[in-house]
Amino acid sequence: MARLTHFDGDGQAHMVDVSGKAVTDRIAVADCYIKMTTQTLDLVEQGTAKKGDVLGVARLAGIMGAKKCADLIPLCHPLPITKVAVDLVPDASLPGVRITATVKTSGQTGVEMEALTAASTAALTVYDMLKAAEKTMEIGGLRVVLKDGGKSGRFEAPEGSAP
């Protein structure tokens, strides 16, 4: 089993020292979904939700979430993020919205947590904007689907492992 780097020899949590690591280009992609009724999805697609442009606001919230990751997760390093993209795609087969967040940096540590935070923040924002219409929405499937750059190399989630 891999050694957990966020704990010292005494088992105490600490922020990992990355000062000796090389600066490399890094990318992470995370995705999730939010399920809802077809009637609620219609509000999204027709732009008739009471709070406004659900997907546009959720996209911005996801971007903001990535930028605030180090403020939310105690042992994350503040990073010079060079790109955040959040894609929200209505999917009638769920029914709901599929969310993908891509984050890039050129730095000494990866951006997986920023991508996960972006995707989850976008999903939470969709919920917030639609909760007056439906309280039974379900957020799920949050995962890293791609991570590249740095010492550990490339990781891609197996195809077909998403709902």
From Swiss-Prot:
Substrate binds at L75, C76, H77, M113, E114. The lineage of its organism: Bacteria, Pseudomonadati, Pseudomonadota, Alphaproteobacteria, Rhodobacterales. The keyword Lyase applies. GO terms for molecular function: cyclic pyranopterin monophosphate synthase activity. The gene is moaC. InterPro entries: MoaC (IPR023045), MoaC_bact/euk (IPR047594), MoaC_sf (IPR036522), MoCo_biosynth_MoaA/MoaC (IPR050105), Mopterin_CF_biosynth-C_dom (IPR002820). This is Cyclic pyranopterin monophosphate synthase. GO terms for biological process: Mo-molybdopterin cofactor biosynthetic process. Homohexamer; trimer of dimers. Its EC number is 4.6.1.17. Belongs to the MoaC family. Keywords: Lyase, Molybdenum cofactor biosynthesis. Pathway: Cofactor biosynthesis; molybdopterin biosynthesis. It is an enzyme of class 4 (lyase). It catalyses: (8S)-3',8-cyclo-7,8-dihydroguanosine 5'-triphosphate = cyclic pyranopterin phosphate + diphosphate. It comes from the Bacteria. The active site is at D128. Catalyzes the conversion of (8S)-3',8-cyclo-7,8-dihydroguanosine 5'-triphosphate to cyclic pyranopterin monophosphate (cPMP). The keyword Lyase applies.
